[in-house]
Amino acid sequence: AFDGSSGPGIVRGMQDINGNGLPDDEWYELKGSEAGKEETIQNFEVTYYRPEGKKMDVQWISSDGRNGWVDYLSAYHTQDYYYPAWISENSYTLTGTCLAARNTQDSQTGYWDNQSYDWGYVDNFGNDQIEGGSTVDGSGQRNGFKISNAIHADGTEANLQYIDFIKIQCGVLAKSGWLGEVSTEVFSFEDLTK
């Protein structure tokens, strides 16, 4: 992310409590600055549907009654469609936290601005950045997270001792016109306690 180009992702962590090396224990969200705010929706669901043909948009319906689609942008991508190739079913549902979108278009220039959140999200130009990344194009930009921010579904502290598995999910359901959907991009994770 860089200033005006945040694609906030929700971070979840899991301890391998049963010791089997698989991510089959409880996931805990690492709360961010928007946790507990009225406009933040917990247990938000979005169901996506496989397109009927190549180069078609992916339709969706959300648990708050909205519906829409993820635009197929052939100028940017060459795959048949954006529906995940590894999912054999004709629809799938994602559940998680949905943040209020902060994307706006400048009426003079036509450029889109995806504003950041204070802290606690990946691919976000917030105040939890770790020194070293570019503020111009986002290369090398890193966000820092605290394991102490892990919470149960009811918002109480999880008190994790460590994290074995990490899962990221886009935190907004929004489009920015000709740029397409607001999405989260993550390239790596690093344990900063070592």
Predicted regions and their residues:
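Acidic, glycine-anchored loop motifs typical of Ca2+
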Residues: I17-E26, D128
